[in-house]
Amino acid sequence: MMCAVTVRQIKPDSYEDFRKAWEPDPWLPKLRNALVLRNEDNPDQVLTIGFFDAGPEQLDTVRDDPAVLAGEDKRLRRIAEFEERVVLNGIFELVEDVKDPAER
């Protein structure tokens, strides 16, 4: 599983608009689900994580698709209106899913 992780500082009081702009449309191939988290101490700092049912090579193939590139370009332009800066952006491979031992 691969994860797209981004932390953004968004403009004050823009969360609802940011959230609408952020939503992938169309939904990305191999994207299983996504999480949107807000910093408790700074609600204008938003962490997004997209979980892809793909290995590194499969995700590269998806990301290189011209239709996906065009859709992501549109989405990022929508987001930019509400974004002050990107704090962190990267693709991470899930290497462990650690669970409570009592739930194993």
Q: Language-model features: where?
A:
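An amphipathic, aromatic/His-enriched active-site/gating alpha helix that lines ligand/cofactor pockets
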Residues: E23-L35, F52-L88
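Active-site-flanking beta-strand signature of metal-NTP-handling nucleotidyl enzymes
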Residues: M2-R8, L47-I49
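Coil-to-beta-strand transition motifs
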Residues: M1, P29, P43-D44
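Short, low-order "capping/linker" segments at domain edges
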Residues: L88-R104
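Short, surface-exposed coil-to-beta transition loops
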Residues: R19, L31-N33, Q45-L47
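Non-catalytic surface loops within mature trypsin-like serine protease
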Residues: I10-P12, D53-A54, E93-E96
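Short, surface-exposed ligand-recognition loops at beta-strand->loop->(often short) alpha-helix junctions
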Residues: V7-R19
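A short beta-turn/loop motif at secondary-structure boundaries
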Residues: L37-P43
